[in-house]
Amino acid sequence: MASSSAPVHFGRYLSMFLVLFIGVYLLAFLTGDKRVVPRLGIDLQGGTRVTLTARTPDGSRPSREALSQAQQIISSRVNGLGVSGSEVVVDGDNLVITVPGNDGNEARNLGQTARLYIRPVLNSLPVQRGQDPKPGSPAGTLPNFAPMPPDHPGAQPRPYLQDPTSSPSSDPMPSPVPTGAALPGEVPSVEQPAPPDPRKDLAERIAEEKKWRQSTKQSIQFLALQFESTHCDKDDILAGNDDPNLPLATCSTDHNMAYLLAPSIISGDQIQNSTSGMNQRGVGYVVDLQFKSAAADVWADFTAAHIGTQTAFTLDSEVVSVPVINEAILGGRTQISGGDPPFTAATARQLANVLKYGSLPLSFEPSEAQTVSATLGLTSLRAGLIAGAIGLSLVLLYSLLYYRVLGLLTAFSLFCSGTIIFAILVLLGRYINYTLDLAGIAGLIIGIGTTADSFVVFFERIKDEIREGRSFRSAVPRGWVRARKTIVSGNAVTFLAAAVLHFLAIGQVKGFAFTLGLTTILDLVVVFLVTWPLVYLASKSPLLARPAYNGLGAVQQVARERRASAKTGRG
């Protein structure tokens, strides 16, 4: 047991909390959008809904298994970004994503197919906006394409998991032969044409796009590259549906360059992990990739054999990065840096997140964002806050009646805990997209109640020391030594329960568990850095040692009676 006579550096403890408090609020007021308001969930302020329509290369309906897998992957992406309170549901052949706030791009990005391929660059052209390639260019103007050697990694087809692609039939359907002429005066029956099938039409467009942009003929490849260089600002119908075993003519994400790429050498399913961070060799941010062992060997052999050449990283059929290989890259690690402009912290984190959880088994066409009204609204928020305020007031009233001045210290500690939790919630909403819903508010209220329990444990240990005959001044440090183990153990159990809920539960239960765990950690911070030093300072005051101020008169009376009984027994 620690000695009760050890020096107490109360000034150091209070200074540490003050630095933490000021630092958190400086970040809240001076960074980001500088709005010191927590990000509220869908149930309190509404959100944005985007419907993702599944599209398959052959025009068939998506399977339930593929939709369920896509739902799970998108849910993992949501959790990876820290976006709480979001909803991902299957609605027929569609996925409906609802996120808090009014940023529709966030919901669309969560539904990104994220099919990553690494392809060697064969040729490139700068984008020529406003110009169309002239049809019928003479063959003599074709550039000298680098021939693909037999040992090139892209020359041998590699197995990839992809949807089967069917080409539309080029043979027209035979016309029905009439069996007889219409009688005079009769109106010939005209068969109404069947309504066009949008899925079949889309499948035909994708198939035609593949024939044009993924041809193995050099002349067609050149025309496709020229065409792409003048149409990079158009929507890509092929997005996420390119065949990795064939060449590809496509554009960069910044729409400044068109590229002709060789077949893929590594696919995104060979990524073991992906993280984001600052670019140590330039500006902006990068995405760090760690390949699986088989892909790491392929990458090492390829980079060693192609020093000085360009290699493209394509995401959903667009080039996101075109690094030059300067040396052999061993260990299975590489980086993706953005184009012009470079990745920001948000875009790098988002790309790393979608690559970490894998590509979707389907490609989706997002709809326009729709505003969703709050399911509960600010009235429920106000009711929850009022309920919390009433409960907190009752706790403070009980503390003042039972502990007197120590109750005031309890109130001050709870104020410190509540204000720092508020600032942290603002920062979490700003940087990891955490949203506070009604379940999260319930977790906050219960967590603050746990903080009050810690004060009660401390004060009751002080009473136990006084019953044993010690003065208020000597009872405080001894009571703290006995109480802190109980406080740490109790908070550890609460935090463990919150952690289990957060990792195993879904939906709003995760928000409840998160705020409960957060307040549990801050409970320890406040008790150790605020409550304990303040109570120790109070024990040094002769005024606060009086029973009328500390509420310990009854306990001190019990101690005097015990001492008197002990003296009588010895006499």
Curated annotation (Swiss-Prot):
Subunit structure of this chain's protein: Forms a complex with SecF. Part of the essential Sec protein translocation apparatus which comprises SecA, SecYEG and auxiliary proteins SecDF. Other proteins may also be involved.
Membrane topology, as annotated: Multi-pass membrane protein
Region: Disordered, residue numbers: 124-199
Source species of the chain: Mycobacterium leprae (strain TN)
Subcellular localization: Cell membrane
Name by which UniProt lists this protein: Protein translocase subunit SecD
BP GO terms, sorted: intracellular protein transmembrane transport; protein targeting; protein transport by the Sec complex
Keyword Protein transport: yes
Transmembrane segment boundaries: 13-33, 383-403, 408-428, 439-459, 487-507, 512-532
Record bears the keyword Iron-sulfur: no
Pfam family, one: Sec_GG
